Amino acid sequence: MEFSLQYITIFIFVILFLIGLFSSKSRSTRRNEKKSRLYLSTENKINIVNKNDHLDVVILSKYKRKALMNKSEYQLFLRLEKLLSKGYQEFRLFTQVSMGEFLESIDKEAHFAINSKRVDFLIVDKNGYAVIVIEYQGQGHYQDNAAKRDAVKREACRKAGVIFLEFQPNYGKAELEFVGENLKRYLIKN
């Protein structure tokens, strides 16, 4: 009888241990599920517990289209397109391009320093390599730390051998011709 009482006691202890183990796992699972939930506060702002769950943020948010460029940037875009179509067809023009897409560094910190910065215009060669970056210095370029951002862009381009040009709002034919001259020089070298 004593022998079976010991087995029963051990059996009960094992059962209680397993119940405790499974209930703590299910509590931690529920806790993790709560971490990834989003909810609307009384101010209709989205409160995000897990900021990595971008799909939930997008589902709960409203979006509308907006212009990729302002009017003066778009005018420059059209003029640059016209320039390329009249003798530089082997080049392509892109706008609002992240620098991390056309420059690279094996140093992670150097990559992070440029990755989120965008250039107004990028001209690439027939193989997709960056040739010229053009920054349009309109009204938006004089806000916050724009001068510092432009200095970072300028230096990164210089180190990578990419031509960096800045156009002021009062640019004219001479600046566009200078783009053409740089493209001609690039074609001769390459």
UniProtKB/Swiss-Prot annotation:
Q: Which UniProt keywords apply?
A: Signal
- The positions making up the signal sequence are 1-28
Q: Which Pfam families match?
A: DUF2726
- InterPro entries attached to this UniProt entry: DUF2726
Q: Which domain of life is it from?
A: Bacteria
Listed name of the protein:
Uncharacterized protein HI_1631
Q: Say which species the protein is native to.
A: Haemophilus influenzae (strain ATCC 51907 / DSM 11121 / KW20 / Rd)
The uppermost taxa in this organism's lineage are: Bacteria, Pseudomonadati, Pseudomonadota, Gammaproteobacteria, Pasteurellales
